Regions:
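Extended, charge-rich alpha-helical interface modules
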Residues: 2-69
Length: 69
């Protein structure tokens, strides 16, 4: 049972870290290479959504730590 718990927690940790990496990479494109995304009038809204994704995933990682014995 302990191995299953660890496997689930590790899978969730990997998932949240991947979400952070994906949002961070996209955010860097918006902030550093905006020519790469073409005409897009809602840059601020999109950047805000990406920051929200990062914050949510980071918060989930913190909660996850409480279940790692």
């Amino acid at each position: 049972m302990e191995m299953l718990k660890k496997a689930i927690l590790k899978a969730l940790e990997d998932k949240y870290n991947a979400q952070i990496s994906e949002a961070d990479a996209t955010l860097k494109i918006y902030l550093e290479q905006s020519v790469g995304i073409g005409e897009h009038p809602q840059h601020i809204d999109e950047v805000d959504k990406l920051i929200e994704k990062i914050a949510t995933a980071e918060e989930k990682l913190e909660v996850l730590k409480g279940y790692d014995d």
